[in-house]
Regions:
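Extracellular S/T/G-rich loop segment that most often corresponds to the catalytic His/Ser-adjacent loop
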Residues: 353-437
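Solvent-exposed loop/turn segments at secondary-structure junctions
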Residues: 123-127, 141-143, 172-173, 193-197, ...
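C-terminal subdomain of the subtilisin-like protease fold in secreted/lumenal serine endopeptidases
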Residues: 439-542
């Protein structure tokens, strides 16, 4: 395959996919510190959202934007550029033993999530060929797509496609190591926000900013030495985070992940339309799982304080859970306006993140790094449910016409890994789809409880903390563990028809023929290193 450069309009801002080393099985997650763990009841604390009233309901879906937005930056593009071959398999796949989990589901149901739909509420999803036509339009709440495309199937930002790829991409190429968690599942795409659009000034004043992304960047994790020929050492965040400057001269930081903030000035997307979309999915039974790698972060101002948009989302996720939809959300990333919850009292956080705040009905996902530790950018909180890989991410190149992958972006001329809780959440959403395939009689809340109960619990009181919740997900355990109440919940085994392609009998010998069937064991006999070419990406970003 050839590598391409993906361009997003602004000179000096680019994203590039480069070399990634093949990784073996990594160590389990390090034990979290004893401080800042959940302590007793949260009643009356800032960490607990005010309960819904009986009459609270989500807003009625209007099917489109609640404001008039205008494109300010051209969509992600590709152009012929460098050609870089890599030896590669994403570390997160090995860490989570996804191949083994997929084999279990396939043997039981005949597919790997083929009877499931996952709704992706994000920046839209490009119909990449590795989806094999399994992406359908949910709607567009930003603007009418270019060239008459169906709503939700344009990804100007290059974020939603990467999220959806982790859930359901299927390269169908043995030379490619990357694969989605549920590669037979269908994606229902809703474009709900975009940093390439802004409110049209002629249509009214902009929405006050309540959660800006960070202004800094971060260095790639140690050991990531893959660079494009003649490239610089990565020192900047992916452009989604607003890090870096042309020429890479801006001050960089190393504790930030990808932020997709709602209600940020100069971008498109509000909590109101997020709530509308959640209701749309629940009312129309559009999907059994929702992934939201978008959030709204604000300062915690005291017990009982909740904003109108937050209340609408709270009502919407309750509405969806009551109608048997599993709701998965990214826990959020540290930014200049979303400080880490590292205060002494875990029940009085500095930052409140929506939708994760509503943990009674949402499975919130924190991020770990490739060493098994908590990613520094992952926002802590009593609402964190589980954790999953969120660094050195590899997924589909979102540029229109691309047939490859991306694992790095460039801001200010410097390559940086794709990372964030945005990309940890789809691992969990994919596992939720597999659990729904294996256990079709479980309702949405029972699916969440199974994922939490089978996670790798941290060494903390009650088996959970504010960093990784109940722990890093364990897909194999989520699919196979015997839990109370499991009788009758497991999908019936799918009969397997064996083809009788035996050679003709040897009439000249009376010696019995013994046919030995060799199966795969639980151990890894050898690591097959795949060799393929990554795509490079360039993203347009406006100067600030």
């Amino acid at each position: 395959m050839h590598a391409f450069r993906r361009r997003l309009g602004l000179p000096g801002r680019a994203g590039v996919a480069v070399l990634v080393a093949g990784l073996g099985v990594l160590s389990p997650i390090a034990a979290a510190p004893a401080s800042a763990q959940t302590a007793g009841t949260l009643a009356g604390t800032w960490a607990t959202p005010p309960p819904l009233s009986p009459g609270d309901s989500p807003p009625t879906d209007t099917g489109g934007p609640d404001k008039t937005y205008k494109k300010k930056t051209e969509c992600v593009q590709r152009s012929l550029g460098q050609n870089v071959e890599i030896n590669f398999r994403p570390w997160g796949q090995d860490y989570l033993q996804l191949q083994k989990a997929q084999d279990i589901v396939r043997a039981t149901t005949g597919s790997v999530g083929g009877n499931q739909k996952v709704a992706v509420i994000d920046t839209g999803v490009t119909p990449h060929p590795w989806f094999q036509g399994r992406v359908e339009s949910g709607g567009d709440y930003v603007a009418n797509p270019d060239n008459g495309q169906p709503g939700g199937l344009q990804d100007c930002d290059g974020h939603g496609t990467e999220v959806a790829g982790i859930i359901a991409a299927n390269p169908q190429d043995p030379k490619v190591g990357f694969i989605g968690v549920a590669p037979d599942a269908r994606i229902v795409s809703y474009r709900q926000l975009s940093e390439n659009y802004a409110e049209d000034d002629s249509a009214g004043a902009g929405t006050p900013s309540t959660g800006q992304p960070p202004s800094g960047g971060n260095k790639p994790p140690a050991g990531n030495t893959g660079q494009p020929p003649g490239g610089n050492t990565g020192t900047a965040l992916p452009p989604e985070n607003g890090g870096g400057a042309p020429g890479g001269t801006a001050k960089q930081q190393n504790d930030k992940g990808d932020n997709r903030q709602l209600q940020k000035k100069g971008t498109a997307g509000t909590l109101h339309t997020l709530a509308q979309i959640i209701r749309n999915i629940a009312d129309g039974h559009r999907a059994g799982v929702i992934n939201m790698s978008v959030d709204h972060c604000r300062a915690a101002t005291g017990p009982g304080d909740i904003q109108t948009g937050e209340r609408e989302v709270q009502a919407a996720v309750r509405y969806a859970a009551d109608r048997d939809v599993v709701v998965v959300a990214a826990a959020g990333n540290v930014s200049d306006s979303c400080p880490q919850n590292d205060q002494a009292d875990p029940n009085k956080p500095k930052s409140i993140v929506t939708p994760p705040w509503f943990s009674d009905d949402v499975l919130s996902v924190g991020a770990i790094d490739d060493g098994g530790g908590v990613a520094s950018f992952s926002v802590h909180g009593p609402w964190v449910g589980v954790a999953a890989p969120g660094t050195k991410i590899v997924s589909l190149d979102p540029a229109v016409g691309s047939t490859g992958l991306a694992n790095l972006t460039i801001a200010g001329g410097n390559p940086s890994p794709i990372q964030g809780t945005s990309f940890a959440a789809p691992y969990v959403a994919g596992v939720a789809a597999l659990v729904r395939s294996m256990y079709p009689r479980l309702n949405a809340r029972e699916v969440i409880k199974r994922i939490e109960a089978t996670a790798q619990h941290p060494a903390a009181p009650g088996g959970r903390d504010n960093f990784v919740g109940y722990g890093v997900i364990d897909p194999v355990a989520a699919l196979t563990a015997n839990l109370p109440g499991d009788v009758g919940n497991l999908a019936p085994p799918k009969p397997v028809v064996q083809a009788a392609n035996l050679p003709p009998a040897d009439g000249g010998s009376s010696t019995p023929m013994i046919v030995a069937l060799a199966g795969t064991g639980g151990g890894l006999a050898a690591l097959i290193i795949t060799l393929f070419v990554m795509h490079t990406i360039r993203r347009n970003r406006p100067e600030h």
